[in-house]
């Protein structure tokens, strides 16, 4: 029950007090961390790898640059960026959830990604970095879980260098109506059952499906990025808008 005097936000389809959402999201990701990569493949039929590859290709990251992989989870993007920036560059894998951060660290070290990667537990709304630190920031399937998205976008803008760019890869609104209906049926009826079967946690995957529906659509997120200060903001619809990649610059 939320008191009238409290500021509220959404947790999936629930209305909750703002100060409660962070802990509730944390519980979800503590629960799913161990099966996160397996479930990503099952949920997207492996297509998430193509979406992330496209994000890397659009990043413009070069040797010697400094990159922040925010809400980086198990480190898929960090692994790619580590190779791109080379020994003279640096990649920061940041996640608010220590279980996800631990999984990412173990996974990357097991495949030999060491030396130019650092790990930081950080809240996107109050990034613990100096102004003008990063050449590129990515946040992949993480923004929809942030309580105050506008505050997080302003925080990302602050720590970007002039000339730097932000890429937001996130589930969005399908642009083909029959696909939208089929996607809803899959998300709300099949996905929680797969989550229960594979990860023994149908409720967390029900939340993830609901959080996708509550996330701003393509044009709304574009406007939010512009309001945070980003310029030349554009987006690419991927898989007919099931996912969108937004990109904005700090000049």
From Swiss-Prot:
PROSITE patterns: SAM_MT_UBIE (PS51608), UBIE_1 (PS01183), UBIE_2 (PS01184)
MF terms in GO: 2-methoxy-6-polyprenyl-1,4-benzoquinol methyltransferase activity; demethylmenaquinone methyltransferase activity
A single GO BP: aerobic respiration
EC number: 2.1.1.163, 2.1.1.201
CDD domains: AdoMet_MTases
Pathway(s) annotated for this protein in UniProt: Quinol/quinone metabolism; menaquinone biosynthesis; menaquinol from 1,4-dihydroxy-2-naphthoate: step 2/2; Cofactor biosynthesis; ubiquinone biosynthesis
Annotated catalysed reactions: a 2-demethylmenaquinol + S-adenosyl-L-methionine = a menaquinol + S-adenosyl-L-homocysteine + H(+); a 2-methoxy-6-(all-trans-polyprenyl)benzene-1,4-diol + S-adenosyl-L-methionine = a 5-methoxy-2-methyl-3-(all-trans-polyprenyl)benzene-1,4-diol + S-adenosyl-L-homocysteine + H(+)
Domain of life of the native organism: Bacteria
Keywords: Menaquinone biosynthesis, Methyltransferase, S-adenosyl-L-methionine, Transferase, Ubiquinone biosynthesis
SUPFAM superfamilies attached to this UniProt entry: S-adenosyl-L-methionine-dependent methyltransferases
Keyword Amino-acid biosynthesis in record: no
Class in the EC hierarchy, top level: transferase
UniProt: S-adenosyl-L-methionine binding residues: 74, 95, 123-124, 140
Disulfide feature: none
HAMAP family hit by this protein: MenG_UbiE_methyltr
PANTHER family linked to this entry: 2-METHOXY-6-POLYPRENYL-1,4-BENZOQUINOL METHYLASE, MITOCHONDRIAL, METHYLTRANSFERASE
Biological function: Methyltransferase required for the conversion of demethylmenaquinol (DMKH2) to menaquinol (MKH2) and the conversion of 2-polyprenyl-6-methoxy-1,4-benzoquinol (DDMQH2) to 2-polyprenyl-3-methyl-6-methoxy-1,4-benzoquinol (DMQH2).
Family membership: Belongs to the class I-like SAM-binding methyltransferase superfamily. MenG/UbiE family.
UniProt-recorded name of the protein: Ubiquinone/menaquinone biosynthesis C-methyltransferase UbiE
């Amino acid at each position: 029950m939320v008191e009238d005097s409290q500021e509220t936000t959404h947790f999936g389809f629930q209305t909750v007090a703002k100060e409660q959402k962070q802990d509730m999201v944390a519980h979800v990701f503590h629960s799913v961390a161990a099966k996160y990569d397996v479930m990503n493949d099952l949920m997207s039929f492996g297509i998430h790898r193509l979406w992330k590859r496209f994000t890397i290709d659009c990043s413009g990251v070069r040797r010697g640059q400094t990159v922040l992989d925010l809400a980086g989870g198990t480190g898929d993007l960090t692994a790619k960026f580590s190779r791109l920036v080379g020994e003279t560059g640096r990649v920061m894998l940041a996640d608010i959830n220590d279980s996800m951060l631990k999984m990412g660290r173990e996974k990357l070290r097991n495949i030999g990604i060491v030396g130019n990667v650092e790990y930081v537990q950080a809240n996107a709304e109050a990034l613990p970095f100096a102004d003008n630190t990063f050449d590129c920031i990515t946040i992949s399937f993480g923004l929809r879980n942030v309580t105050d998205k506008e505050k997080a976008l302003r925080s990302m803008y602050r720590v970007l260098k002039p000339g730097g760019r932000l890429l937001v890869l996130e589930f969005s609104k399908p642009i083909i109506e029959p696909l939208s209906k089929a996607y809803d049926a899959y998300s709300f009826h099949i996905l929680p059952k797969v989550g229960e079967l594979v990860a023994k946690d149908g409720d967390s995957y029900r939340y993830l499906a609901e959080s996708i529906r509550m996330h701003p659509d393509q044009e709304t997120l574009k406007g939010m990025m512009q309001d945070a200060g980003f310029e030349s903001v554009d987006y690419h619809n991927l898989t007919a808008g099931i996912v969108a990649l937004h990109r904005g610059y700090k000049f």
